[in-house]
Amino acid sequence: ALPEIPAALPVIEIPEFHFTKIAPLFSNLPEAKQTVDIQPMEQFNQGWGTILYRTTLPEAVKSGTTLKITEVHDWAQIYADGKLLTRLDRRKGEFTTVLPALKKGTQLDILVEAMGRVNFDKSIHDRKGITEKVELVSGDRSKELKNWTVYSFPVDYSFIKNKNYQDTKILPAMPAYYKTTFKLDKVGDTFLDMSTWGKGMV
């Protein structure tokens, strides 16, 4: 015989709370790794989470030049000297963006999040991060970007708990870790309403 259906867990509502402790991601970078050619995160002993690829432009880039990434797996944010240029989504087939004019020596950051893996069929070898290369394309000319500094951000509590959190009331425009505390009279099932936030993880 089947056992009795257990009683439903209690449901609670958490009052609204605010975040006041913030650690900007780019100010809390882990140990850097160096590579001439770009490689997926598995080559850096990372299986999930987020990875940051950083290089400097060896020459000035003209407005209208295309940045081509082969390939983004799975969701990327692209920054030039800390300014967000665009976001690319593999699910939508987004692997290119048109750049503004950028000076020689501009710091180019590509922050890539892995969003799960294909686990069957011909795509089972689903590497994460950037799988092959990054190119600057102008007309019929292309130049592959080299000499990358790489930072791995695994998704686990031990990695994020010791960041340099600072008190602030101003939310940064850059990716960041957010931390707060709240008190409960009792515990139970609940949902967090993140509808006013952007993309991230709790």
Where are the regions that the model predicts?
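Ordered hydrophobic segments in well-structured contexts
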Residues: T50-R54, Q77, R87, D109-L111, ...
